[in-house]
Amino acid sequence: MWVVMVNRVIVPDSIESINQKYNRTMGRAFEYRKARKMKRWGHMARVFTKIGKEIEIAVKAGGSDPSANTRLRILMQNAKAENMPKENVERAIKRATEKDAADYKEVVYEGYGPHGVAFLVETATDNTNRTVANIRMYFNKCGGALGNSGSVGFMFEHKCVFKFKAEGVDPEELELEMIDLGVDEFYVEEDGISVYAAYESFGAIQKWLDEQGYEIVSGESVRIPTDTKELDAEGRESVERLVEKLEEDDDVVNVYHTMAEEE
């Protein structure tokens, strides 16, 4: 396994040594947080619901043909990576084309949780009044407060992350090519390559990967905190309670916060 940081290539002795050396990088911190979220959800139903809503939004915005709708195409690849049955994907596409289809909107909410930890909550909802009322209730019950738009958004970097397969490629040469596309973190792993870049580079990176013939495994938007806050065990528990409350809501797609990850 290789890890290539911009303008630098490091060949470690093992995967474990990579994790120890780079567990503070933006991308790796996001991966650890995502893994814990999946563990909390405990089953794939929540993941399928999330992807299904995103597919419906993409179809309404750009049509049901994945060859002409780049967002839909990447979501279908994400669904495959999560082992979402093909029938579920087809149903989501069909629902979006029906006359009485739910009109989902993507809305981001911002606020502060316990101990001044900043929260950014991404939702996909067909009823914003219901969603904002529920989210405000979760914040209030857990010792936090829902804020105004822009109140904490500046504390997070909006990034895109792609995972793709590129067998038989020189990682140093590939890294140099992708730097020109805006990539600032580059990982070569046993099952493929992961890259991170500013979200504005999403379309350019997806187009380039398609043109080069690389198999895209997944592509998504993420929010990564620019700074984090250390908390003791009791503080962490109170923040995790709010995270769990938010993630249990069917309208919530992603929850990001500025609490530091455990060592």
Q: Model-found features: residue ranges?
A:
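Short terminal hydrophobic/aromatic SLiMs and anchors at protein ends
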Residues: 9-18, 22
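N-terminal cationic and glycine-rich segments that engage phosphates or anionic surfaces
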Residues: 22-147, 152-161, 257
